[in-house]
């Protein structure tokens, strides 16, 4: 534990002495946020009691509570003062009127709900650029201190202080923003679930938009993190090399370890969030496909019959491959006994099972990949996938890609994975599918 941190008993004693007791219901939280927004528009950061009463009146109007405004406003103000969200000041210079200012606690709570909600790739890039500059200056100062034999005061001011009070705080801000994005993803999942529960047919387009937007945002943020992560780690290692073996600078070495852990956690969060979201994306699409398969003989046929009935009011076009099956729409309860109406499976596919198809793909891919191994040729999965997927229909792309990746990782591994180098995303078909994999160049 670094010397600037506090122990658990110290923090417990500090909180106990000040008798902290926080309780914010929806109305009180809304009132605090409204105060924070109003305070941001004032140059002096000070508010009078009449201002707080007017703000409370607007909040109460939104909650449809317009009675006893003054009394309830005074109670709310006293409650926020008691919980130390705002401070009250009064003196002879204010003619007996009290002035109010937000406390650090009030600023922190309101800032979390207002400004921290915006987390974009642009903001992340700016934060990482600031961090890179601070670490660069700190590393140069550390190397200069080693050459000139500077004392501990120099190390604290030019190396420790920027890392502790600038870099670490920005890392904490990014970490907090990522946790907020976790909440946003959960709210999007709830929104998708609600859409699918109410009317999944009308919700398919909205679900696709939400899924694509979230996937794109996560991938863009992760690309930004990957681009800066290695450079930041390298700069931290430069500083760590400068303090290695110097026991009097233990506090800097401990801080470097903490920063490296935070940076690793920030970068790994992005990839983990993408993996989890991809799994959820597949789950939603599987649900939609299942719902369509189960529903096609009920709601779909009913909607089509309604469209036919109202054709002259709303004309439409219908393309069909087997027009004779339209007779099935005459009666929803019709028992289909005619074998011709159901159609027959082509003889070439009649006895083809999924396992047989899988075995065929495995044999073909093994023959392809073993050839690379025998000639000690590196396997570029993105290139192999793109070449092979061109030979298969879209419906089999997922199975083929899964088999290729599975067989490739059994043959060898990528040396770039051991050095922590992230590969770029490469397209593997004409439908937007991408893969991120280093070249396999070491065989087992």
UniProtKB/Swiss-Prot annotation:
Keywords: Calcium, Cell cycle, Cell division, Chromosome partition, Cytoplasm, DNA condensation. Gene3D superfamilies: Chromosome partition protein MukF, middle domain (1.20.58.590), MukF, C-terminal domain (1.10.225.40), Winged helix-like DNA-binding domain superfamily/Winged helix DNA-binding domain (1.10.10.10). Involved in chromosome condensation, segregation and cell cycle progression. May participate in facilitating chromosome segregation by condensation DNA from both sides of a centrally located replisome during cell division. Not required for mini-F plasmid partitioning. Probably acts via its interaction with MukB and MukE. Overexpression results in anucleate cells. It has a calcium binding activity. One of its GO terms (molecular function) is calcium ion binding. Residues 211-239 are annotated as: Leucine-zipper. InterPro entries: Chromosome_partition_MukF (IPR005582), MukF_C (IPR033441), MukF_C_sf (IPR038198), MukF_M (IPR033440), MukF_M_sp (IPR036141), MukF_WHTH (IPR033439), WH-like_DNA-bd_sf (IPR036388), WH_DNA-bd_sf (IPR036390). Interacts, and probably forms a ternary complex, with MukE and MukB via its C-terminal region. The complex formation is stimulated by calcium or magnesium. It is required for an interaction between MukE and MukB. Belongs to the MukF family. NCBIfam families: PRK05260.1. GO terms for cellular component: cytoplasm; nucleoid. It holds the Pfam family MukF_C. The lineage of its organism: Bacteria, Pseudomonadati, Pseudomonadota, Gammaproteobacteria, Pasteurellales. It is found in: Cytoplasm, Nucleoid. The keyword Lipid biosynthesis does not apply. This is Chromosome partition protein MukF. GO terms for biological process: cell division; chromosome condensation; chromosome segregation; DNA replication. The gene is mukF.
């Amino acid at each position: 534990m670094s010397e600037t941190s506090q122990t658990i008993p110290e923090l417990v004693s500090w909180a106990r002495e000040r008798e902290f007791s926080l309780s914010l219901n929806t109305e009180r939280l809304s009132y605090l946020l409204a105060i924070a927004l109003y305070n941001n528009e004032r140059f002096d950061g000070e508010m009078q009691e009449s201002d707080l009463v007017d703000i409370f009146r607007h909040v109460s109007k939104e909650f449809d509570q317009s009675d006893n405004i003054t009394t309830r406003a005074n109670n709310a103000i006293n409650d926020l003062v008691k919980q130390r969200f705002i401070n009250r000041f009064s003196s002879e210079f204010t003619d007996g009127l009290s002035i109010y200012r937000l406390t650090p606690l009030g600023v922190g709570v309101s800032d979390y709900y207002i400004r921290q909600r915006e987390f974009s790739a642009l903001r992340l890039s700016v934060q990482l650029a600031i961090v890179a500059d601070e670490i660069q200056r700190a590393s140069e100062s550390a190397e200069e201190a080693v050459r000139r034999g500077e004392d501990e005061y120099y190390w604290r001011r030019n190396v420790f202080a920027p890392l502790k009070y600038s870099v670490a705080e920005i890392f904490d801000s990014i970490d907090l923003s990522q946790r907020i994005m976790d909440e946003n993803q959960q709210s999007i999942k709830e929104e998708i679930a609600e859409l699918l529960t109410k009317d999944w047919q009308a919700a398919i387009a909205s679900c696709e938009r939400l899924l694509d937007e979230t996937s794109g945002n996560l991938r863009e943020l992760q690309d930004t993190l990957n681009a800066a992560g290695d450079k930041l780690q390298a700069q931290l290692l430069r500083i760590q090399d400068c303090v290695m073996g110097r026991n009097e600078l233990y506090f800097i070495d401990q801080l470097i370890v903490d920063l490296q852990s935070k940076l690793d956690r920030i970068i790994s969060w992005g990839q983990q969030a993408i993996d989890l979201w991809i799994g959820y994306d597949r789950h939603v699409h599987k649900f939609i496909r299942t719902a369509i398969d189960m529903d096609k003989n009920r709601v779909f046929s009913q909607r089509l019959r309604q469209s036919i009935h109202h054709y002259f009011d709303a004309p439409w076009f219908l393309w069909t491959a087997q027009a004779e099956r339209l007779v099935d729409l005459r009666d929803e309860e019709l028992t289909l006994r005619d074998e011709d109406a159901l159609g027959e499976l082509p003889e070439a596919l009649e006895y083809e099972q999924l396992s047989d198809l899988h075995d065929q793909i495995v044999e073909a891919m093994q023959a392809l990949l073993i050839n690379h191994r025998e000639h000690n040729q590196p396997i570029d999965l993105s290139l192999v996938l793109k070449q092979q997927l061109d030979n298969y229909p879209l419906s089999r792309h997922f199975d083929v890609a899964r088999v290729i990746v599975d067989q490739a990782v059994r043959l060898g591994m990528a040396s770039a994975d051991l050095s922590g180098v992230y590969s770029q995303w490469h397209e593997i078909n004409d439908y937007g599918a991408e893969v991120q994999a280093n070249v396999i160049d070491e065989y087992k």
